[in-house]
């Protein structure tokens, strides 16, 4: 009996020591560089957001924040690395809706659950998408486009950057809201998609607004509307699709946020969020993100978590209705 009690006491002491060590590590965090994983190659929207924020975040934390690009599989390789990483605050993710919420709804091979396996830290903001049409398409605005599409079901085509991407889901949401049948043509990149749109090989495309804007401003394409609930400050002359009665339920953007492994210690989450809020309030950071079409709307961990749950629910409805599967 005494031996059992001694063993139990030793176990309790060991647990207490481990807990104290963990608390001490959290209190002094960070003591070394932090890796910020981006699940895409350099040069894309998520990478741009990460590289805009990382230097300033590093200054405030007193440690370097190093970008690690792990491109491939729609961002899921990078997200999976963070899911499996030690929850010590030294491996973080600049996440987006694609790998955090959409991937597991469209791809059975994705084993993690972004809602449960990643800890929301700070919501950064959204980047609007826009529906554009090829030169000469006989529809001057979104209302006329819906009329045209209804008159010839399945004849019009729209392009996106791939099956299961936010651009694809936005296109399907437009179809569902407008009660039209438009054929989806997936592309592997925005460049090829824009080339074929300008050449008239496809009728419509859902693009990130910042990518489409030069073509819109040069009158090379017709802009039918942004996919957000209201007009974008980047292109105030482009209407929101939701301004058209048949499309009033269209409200979607490409979103970005800082995340970590699910069991990231609360003090680390709070410190990161505090410093992120300060970084996102910096005029130079806001200016650079705005130039890329990112509308900064920072939110705390609880708000960000609620946003992810709501968006995942919306994505699920779109995916199931459209039958999207990779």
What are these regions (language model features)?
Residues 45-49, 53, 57, 78, ...:
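Stable alpha-helical elements in mature extracytoplasmic
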Residues 24-116, 155, 179-206, 215, ...:
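N-terminal (or domain-start) structured segment
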Residues 93-96, 160, 225-226:
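Short beta-strand segments
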Residues 31-33, 176-177, 217-218, 243, ...:
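An extracytoplasmic/periplasmic, membrane-proximal ligand-sensing/linker region
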Residues 84-90, 105-192, 241-246, 255-288:
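Hinge/capping helix and adjacent helix->loop/strand transition within the periplasmic-binding protein
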Residues 1-31, 143, 326:
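Short, low-complexity disordered leader/linker segments with a strong preference
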Residues 100-109, 168, 173-177, 204-238:
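A ligand-binding cleft/hinge motif common to bilobed small-molecule-binding domains
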């Amino acid at each position: 009996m005494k031996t059992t009690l001694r063993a139990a006491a030793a176990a309790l002491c060991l647990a207490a020591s481990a807990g104290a060590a963990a608390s001490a590590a959290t209190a002094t965090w960070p003591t070394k560089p932090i890796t910020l994983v981006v699940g895409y190659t350099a040069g894309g929207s998520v990478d741009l957001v990460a590289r805009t924020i990382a230097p300033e975040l590093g200054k405030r934390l007193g440690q370097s924040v190093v970008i690690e690009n792990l491109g491939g599989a729609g961002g899921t390789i990078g997200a999976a690395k963070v899911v499996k990483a030690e929850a010590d605050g030294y491996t973080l993710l600049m996440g987006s809706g694609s790998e955090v919420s959409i991937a597991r709804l469209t791809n059975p091979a994705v084993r993690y659950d972004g809602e449960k396996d990643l800890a929301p830290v700070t919501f950064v903001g959204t980047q609007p998408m826009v529906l554009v049409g090829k030169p000469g398409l006989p529809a001057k605005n979104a209302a006329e486009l819906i009329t045209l599409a209804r008159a010839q079901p399945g004849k019009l085509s729209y392009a996106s950057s791939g099956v299961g991407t936010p651009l694809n889901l936005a296109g399907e949401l437009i179809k569902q809201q407008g009660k039209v049948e438009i054929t989806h043509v997936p592309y592997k990149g925005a460049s090829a998609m824009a080339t074929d749109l300008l050449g008239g090989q496809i009728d419509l495309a859902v693009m990130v607004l910042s990518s489409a804007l030069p073509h819109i401003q040069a009158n090379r394409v017709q802009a039918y509307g942004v996919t957000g609930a209201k007009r974008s400050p980047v292109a105030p002359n482009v209407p929101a699709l939701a301004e058209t009665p048949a499309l009033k339920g269209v409200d979607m953007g490409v979103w970005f946020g800082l995340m970590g492994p699910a069991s990231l210690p609360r003090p680390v989450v709070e410190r990161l969020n505090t410093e992120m809020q300060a970084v996102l309030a910096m005029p130079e950071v806001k200016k650079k993100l705005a130039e890329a079409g990112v509308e900064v709307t920072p939110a705390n961990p609880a708000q960000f978590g609620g946003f992810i749950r709501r968006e995942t629910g919306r994505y699920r409805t779109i995916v199931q209705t459209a039958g999207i599967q990779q």
